[in-house]
């Protein structure tokens, strides 16, 4: 049976209700009572047998005590040698058996942004994917930790349904109606690729190559598929979009304070902690494969505290639950920090060596005191303006080792932060500077003043959390041997998310809970980091010259939102762009003009559906794009609003790799079946598009074009040759196939092929069994050690290397002009913007849910059955009663931007005044032409647009998914009413 011709079982297959004809020998004889079959050997009918059992019961003959003969002496019962073999109507059992019968098994996984990276076995029968099953062969590396096997969730367990689903796109499609109208014409691959190629050649030849962009998220979930389009866009001189900041998954407080994108312990390390606070991380919903470590840690004596606004699915499994008001997590964290500091529960040695707390701050400017400020300091630093100063215990000014002034760039492990003197933590003095005598204080003194604002009365008033409760939690956290915070998206979705991140990080810093197993702040939101970094990077961006763009800013700018922004914020955005701190493409031309973007490729993502400011994206940005190409295995919202849709292979039809920072393994995708219909893998699609572009350019005689920004030429007549060439070895045609690209990543990555070792992980190794990575490369902060779970920050805490910040330490004081101007040089709590979306009484949140990974599985029939089958709005009972709303009513949630109709669900576990809709419902799943993001405006925070230092940016500089403005999903106001104005 061909999988292209049939997607379900034949109608004639047998069932328990309709036995096949070949069971005639088991049928009752003529004259027997209907429905009372007689066993062919014993001559005993089922009714007679049951009557006999009943008599035996009445006579008190227990089956456990009665002899074999006692039943048969009752008459009519005869022994049966093979009762199972002679039982009638048994062919139905073959259906069950056939479920566990297969022709082949392939190892694969799922390319979704969930951080799971779970290995699955995919079973094939008669050319059809029959089912999937979690593999159970992750190798154990520490017998004292819970078994890592198996990993998976209910979404992965029904991906088979997608393989032959009605949503599958089987052929190239061209739009013939309006965008979003759903009118398509089937075209050939040659027609599709030729039309796209001719458009691309036109754009590049006209110098508009930077008007071509590609959006695809999360390389770790399938790096070859990520690289497929990124590689071509890079060769064309086009623009690669960020994604981690766009989804508001990036915690900006981490690059601000620690100078890194993020680094986390693998989830197995949770078991090593004595104390865990799950803060805004609904582990039992969004981290299902890893939840076992959180749950089992309780059996290991770990105390688990939950901080959630609602009584969530994770809160019910914690020992204590704190419920601060929405958007007040920062105030709660600062209150806990104030308790720790005020009661002397901090780790003084850690603060002196590992943080900026002893550094001196000028009281006249708010800037760090630098060696260049003080004539009496004779420094050997190459950049004395970035050589920062401390006071030793005798009151003498000393240079802070590891400062940026003596380092060669952001990351320089040739220096050390180890101290040969005892610095003052709480110091204050007057210093003779180049401009006169200036009073200076330590950062610690400044921090204590800030924390004094967050006394118990203030914190309780702001958060409603009990004073004694949060103070006790703070003490317990500080006094635990190994304490850890697991932070989730619940902290990231707010406008002031950077302040929230910094405040939570402060708790682990104050208590010295960094740099060893069982400690740290683990931030798991999005599968953001890829282990095999170098191989992925050079595969994705072979020229080494990348036009990366922060997607939030790109969207904000081209959707016309900047023109409607408050003047102060708009001025900051323009200043950041003008100074080159944040790029926007297309670039400004010599005459001062800036073209509109013209071309967008989307693959492995659902940009249109997930876009904040969704109304502006549709009305302002989308009309500027002459060509939107979506590469997709299913018809989602972005595909609906595209011009050409190309069918790509499903997750069970291709070669690729999978990894995550939740564990230290790499494992593969392998094709269980051939791609459905005319679909091709992402790598094949972009490879063939490159080939078509080269053909068109050659026919036209298009000459190489000098890149305006980089020292390179864009040569369309060799773009296919360049695409399939191994740029590391120079071998021509080496990367023509997907599997070769997988091998390339593994071969060219330190994590899988260490330079100082004979060990190497090959693709074949991963097919045999998930492989634990051999080393941690340069973009990780600890080594992978045999026999222990990965835990970050050891490079700094144990090895004394400088942190990649201006100070060379964990940096809580940021003396950038914008931070000082906005009063955010230290972590503090601020209210969010007022009346975003309008002056309405309720907050609107869109958290991650249990039944989908972003929009994948949002249209799954099986999973829709678990959640009422349609979009839901969760309301507190009192909010619903106040509006005359009952469970199951159709309601409208609305603000100044849009109104969305959906079903109300009464949710007693939430706080009053909050309306929540789990995010990522597809636009076509709503009755109105809106979606969950239609209600959400787009706005950006100026502190996330800076470069620091302003002139060189070693600490904070735009790099895709490391530093850039985040999207904001919360801080939105709405109201709710019954649909139709309350009329029945």
From Swiss-Prot:
Keyword Cell inner membrane: no
Region called Disordered, residue ranges: 1-43
Cofactor dependence: [4Fe-4S] cluster; Mo-bis(molybdopterin guanine dinucleotide)
Positions with a binding annotation for Mo-bis(molybdopterin guanine dinucleotide): 249
Induction: By nitrate.
Topology in membrane: Peripheral membrane protein
Temperature profile: Optimum temperature is 70 degrees Celsius.
Name of protein: Respiratory nitrate reductase subunit alpha
